From Swiss-Prot:
UniProt-annotated location(s): Cytoplasm
UniProt similarity note: Belongs to the transferase hexapeptide repeat family.
The organism's taxonomic lineage, starting at the top: Bacteria, Pseudomonadati, Pseudomonadota, Alphaproteobacteria, Rickettsiales
Protein's UniProt name: 2,3,4,5-tetrahydropyridine-2,6-dicarboxylate N-succinyltransferase
Cysteine pairings via disulfide bonds: none
Transit peptide is among the record's keywords: no
Any GO CC annotation of this UniProt entry: cytoplasm
Organism: Rickettsia prowazekii (strain Madrid E)
Amino acid sequence: MSYIIKEIEEAWQIKENILHDSSKLIKLKKILNESIASLNQGIIRVCEKQGNQWKVNEWVKKAILLYFITTESQLYNNNYNSWYDKVAPKFPADTDKNIFKEAAIRKVPGAIVRTGTYIAKNVVIMPSFINIGAYIDEGTMIDTWATIGSCAQIGKNCHISGGAGIGGVLEPLQAKPVIIEDNCFVGARSEIAEGVIVEEGSVISMGVFIGSSTKIVYRDTGEIIYGRIPAYSVVVPGILPPPEVGKPGLYCVVIVKQVDKTTRGKVSINDLLR
């Protein structure tokens, strides 16, 4: 892997001219195809947890961006649609059923998954869109019309509900993607973007919008934080009162409670929201 990283870093330095050097281009394409295949298999990933911190592997982002630069668009078809793109589908129309059986995943009509995406065992993909570089861990459901952006990281046993959006990021290189840790629920039509981290066991109610500048308010203390939903939080949309009467209030999200693993195991997600 160190050889691949070295080659990608060197190619990145000359990316503006790489298309004009045919010998380097042929060599680079082979390396990039290996990198995309490794993303597909979960061997490498854009972001990974080391201890309690998430670390961005910038070279993987560079590999994806170089793949876009060096790949020409082509026509793709399945039984009911055609499209013209630089990125092939992860599951083309002629995918053998044994591939799905061995992977232990379920994918229904209308689900679009680009290559360079890792889909772990027992994942269910309803009609939705999952972009290149995304990582979907075991037992997660991507529900109808949800979108998973490029490089987004979704943990084990999560439920990304209907119409929810999980933002993606390829640039800037050092920026973290949106990260949804294990055992999280993201409610319908919610949007999590701009590198926000939703920590393990959290429940995001329907219609919650969280970006890097969104105020996240603890209801019991009034403390305000940004960019991170603490583990085992239950979050609903809210509004902060204006400083002066007659002025508009501002949108925020509210941590209404935090529960431990024991409590969460005894109640359903709907009970927690209520």
